[in-house]
Amino acid sequence: MRFKSFDIVPHGTKFDFVGKRHIAVVLSLIVNAAVLLWAVPAIHGLNFGVDFAGGTEMEVKFAQPVDAGAIRKSVEDLGFKGASVQTYGDEEEHAFLIRVERIALMGEEDVKRVVDAVQAKFPVERWSFNPEIGDKIDFEFKQPPSPQALQAAVEGAGVGVREVRAEQGLAAGTRSFAVITQGIREKIERDLSTHFAQAQPEVRRVEYVGPAVGRELRNQGFKAVLYAMALIVVYVGLRFDFRFSPGVIIAILHDAIVTLGYFAFTGREFNLTSIAVLLTVVGYSVNDTVVVYDRIRENQAKYKGKSLAEIVNLSINETLGRTFLTSFATALSLVGLLVYGVGTLFDFSAAMLVGIVSGTYSTWFIAAPMTIWFEERAAKKKASTPAAAAPSAPGRAAQK
């Protein structure tokens, strides 16, 4: 008994992928150049999240449903422009992640105002402020004031104080005080409690990422993508031939840049999850490419008389159904996440969808066709070597 199958991609297709490679390469160059230009900070830049830019992330739970837009407006009205508010966890929990790009309320002007106010009342030996910490000013006195008097002086400068902590002075005969100012958590928590009193907001978790740590995370993330690409090139070279590696590295670079374009052009937040997307796209892209390369290797042994261009075109057509259906099935699951996903999950799904489309395209038009281009260049270079030596032949003949 034979079963009838429904083929989305019919057998025996004869699309000329190799013949269209020049158009595809020009199109890819334009798209990649546009993404890279738009991602330059001086032109537009990526919207780095708290993970990479540094800042404060708060998880807040409400007892009743609250609109994310209303929370965002409330936070931005406090002076935190560009605040990100996303739903977190199950919808029934009414939990949100609030991200702001600052780890402290105090800037340079605030610190100067506080120091001037304290110095106007007490003889300060020295003071220090670490912007990486952002909410603590250290004062050292020979004749220390009482903690209450110091707190009153700081609050008189318009800065709320959470704690004044006495510490041992650095020099003999001195006394230090660490003034801990009210931070972002207290300000946002107080504001939410005022505007959403009936919803009973509860701060579950607060995380701070300093700018230096954010830069380090960002650099390490991009390094991880580059290391993954390098290992993939080595794998392809060992499994097939290192002649195939340039095509692979160009294809996965193409896919990573196109996926990056989703974050660059939409302005969506680029964070550690985005790095995970790039790594996933790179791995997914090379999977399709390996399928085509396997078929090329088989067909090279099978069709000795055919040129590499003919074998590549034949191999892509023979694996067309498999590569298309694999990508199509994955895309269907991502569409479901796009419909029901929010926040980070939505961005992950959307960027993955862009990467899968790009990966399928690069498998057909970039990876294998670029291998042909490198082979043709190598053949021309090899052919030009005897030609360069040809003028010496007549001289040898004359000597005979």
Range-by-range predicted roles:
Residues 1-400:
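A structural signal for conserved, well-ordered secondary-structure elements
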